[in-house]
């Protein structure tokens, strides 16, 4: 399980060092093999351990292919997916096209989302975090299924 928001930096080549607290789990789960693709909803990237991504692919493959919205989602997620591997220093290279999509420069945030990470531009992350907090505090903003969640 991946949790927490981690400030990370991309070097001049677009490499990012995976925080050390996640490296052992990624090494044991998937030998450091990752898939990075766009997030179809938010302006960020999703970084999956290979075993998690294979489950996503199976679900996408099972969708009826004659529905345009299914094909659209498949094109976005699978068409932008890139296989990556952590190097000996625990780094991975974010391809230029994906860096452009998420507007990643030097400062970024790697945010654990249980089964995957989201990779955000730091300023975009700060803005969406503030907006999310403001939205959830509005009366009636909490969905019914979350009202009974014990935190």
From Swiss-Prot:
Pfam families referenced in this protein's UniProt entry, alphabetically: MraZ (PF02381)
PROSITE patterns: SPOVT_ABRB (PS51740)
Keywords carried by this UniProt record: Cytoplasm, DNA-binding, Repeat, Transcription, Transcription regulation
GO CC annotations, alphabetized: cytoplasm; nucleoid
Span of domain SpoVT-AbrB: 5-52, 81-124
Subcellular location as annotated: Cytoplasm, Nucleoid
InterPro entries (UniProt xref): MraZ, MraZ_C, MraZ_dom, MraZ_N, MraZ_sf, SpoVT-AbrB_dom, SpoVT-AbrB_sf
Main localization (coarse): cytoplasm
GO biological process: negative regulation of DNA-templated transcription initiation
Gene Ontology terms for molecular function: DNA-binding transcription factor activity; transcription cis-regulatory region binding
HAMAP family cross-referenced by the UniProt entry: MraZ
NCBIfam families with a match to the protein in the record: division/cell wall cluster transcriptional repressor MraZ (TIGR00242)
Protein family according to the UniProt entry: Belongs to the MraZ family.
Subunit composition and interactions: Forms oligomers.
Protein name: Transcriptional regulator MraZ
Species name: Pseudomonas putida (strain ATCC 47054 / DSM 6125 / CFBP 8728 / NCIMB 11950 / KT2440)
Organism classification: Bacteria, Pseudomonadati, Pseudomonadota, Gammaproteobacteria, Pseudomonadales
Gene designation: mraZ
